[in-house]
Amino acid sequence: MHNLFLYSVVFSLGLVSFITCFAAEFKRTQKEDIRWDTERNCYVPGSHAFGLGSAAVLCFCLAQIVGNIVVFRNHRTRTKREDGYKITDLTLPTVLLLLSWSNFVVVVLILSTAISMSRAQAYGEGWLDEDCYLVKDGVFAASGCLAILGLGALTISATRIKVKKQQQLVQVVIKDQNQDQRRSMEEEQKHDEHQTNKSESVIHLVEEVSSTNISRI
């Protein structure tokens, strides 16, 4: 139940990040917003994309953190036993986790750059080397799509670890049941052998006693 709540938090934060990225795409500074002075110095006013992009980055980072908490919980709470039971096949979850973190770094770098360009660029200062820069078409939208992709990979990784743990736990329970049955059968067999040996001993003693009595007669 606790993991379900964390999954819903990741989904909600990811959805907010996705929506704010697309909102920033429509609110970004356009070419016609650029102004020039008599010395051909450029000026770009700030746009709402700055605030929207900042909110998108914040939500995405929080979603990534919560998602990794779920992964850590699922991995840390795996069943450990005296016979050395542990989850060994984590290839797919590990690949998805690495993909998620690589995607996270790319998205944060792209959004951080786009957010920085969305601030006001004063005359004679610009954004870099006194030149003004604008965010290209589709940058915010693509970042939102990548954010959803990365969070999806992270969620699948956490779910896969959980499912793998449950599957191996079932296998261990079945193995224990088989071992108990085998042990019970061995004990019954030993008991039967003991009874058989005991019966044979009694028969042998009776035969000896009978033989002795006959000899005396």
Curated annotation (Swiss-Prot):
Bilayer topology: Multi-pass membrane protein
InterPro entries: DEAL/Modifying_wall_lignin1/2, DESIGUAL
Residue intervals annotated with topology Cytoplasmic: 24-51, 116-137
Glycosylation (residues): 197, 213
Keywords: Cell membrane, Glycoprotein, Lignin biosynthesis, Membrane, Signal, Transmembrane, Transmembrane helix
Keyword Cell membrane: yes
UniProt similarity note: Belongs to the DESIGUAL family.
UniProt cross-references to PANTHER family, sorted A to Z: OS07G0462200 PROTEIN-RELATED
Name recorded for this polypeptide: Protein MODIFYING WALL LIGNIN-2
